Amino acid sequence: MRFNPPLEEARLIRRYKRFLTDIETVTGELLTIHCPNTGSMLNCMVEGGQVWFSRSNDPKRKLPGTWEIAETPQGRLACVNTARANQLVEEALLAGVITELNGFTALKREVPYGQEKSRIDFRLDYPDGAAYVEVKSVTLGFDGSAVAAFPDAVTQRGAKHLRELAHLARQGVRAVQLYCVNLSGIDAVRPAVEIDAAYAAALREAKSAGVEVLAYGVRVTSEEICVDRRLDVLLD
């Protein structure tokens, strides 16, 4: 996925009210742009740090742009726009990059399902049945480690999705939790038990119930982002 028009570089001033970010462009322009991430963004918010944003020319938009990429304290690039994860995964599914899920005949988005009135990110239809795929965007990394972690904040919604997937798996339906790791320099992903122990427990329970747990890494640059490799998932 290439950024078109190209992203613009800026310096982060602050993020506030969850969805607002103040930046200074390389030309000295001060802007308030949209922050498309509801998480804590623990390692993605460095005041004065380098960021990249997409600018909108839509006169109906209240804000002139969207924060897309941040440079972390470890020098990695993180795609902080969580909406990109589903776009990247769909692109990878259609290109056959996620080999475990190849062979589907139809792809449907945001399909209602489950006991708790959820919507699955993707339902893939195969000749012998359907697979339900839940996508999570991962950007949390640590100094001196090539292992990313999810979540970066307590997520009751994420735990609910795991319960829904586990219920499907127990019924013999193929259920998949897919982590889209939008952070460069990563080899594996794990549950962030130190941040949300309940989510970590729900993930292990879902795996025991038969849910497939996959992780794929994204090559992140300021020009292009794309899913390019499978990563290990560490649950022990």
UniProtKB/Swiss-Prot annotation:
Domain of life per record? Bacteria
Q: Which residues form the signal peptide?
A: none
> GO molecular function, one example?
DNA binding
Pfam families, alphabetized: SfsA (PF03749), SfsA_N (PF17746)
TM segment ranges: none
Q: Which InterPro entries match?
A: SfsA, SfsA_C, SfsA_N
Do you know which HAMAP family this protein is assigned to? SfsA (MF_00095)
- Tell me its family: Belongs to the SfsA family.
Q: What is this protein called?
A: Sugar fermentation stimulation protein homolog
Q: Which organism is it from?
A: Pseudomonas fluorescens (strain SBW25)
User: What taxonomic lineage is listed for the species of origin?
Assistant: Bacteria, Pseudomonadati, Pseudomonadota, Gammaproteobacteria, Pseudomonadales
GN (gene name): sfsA
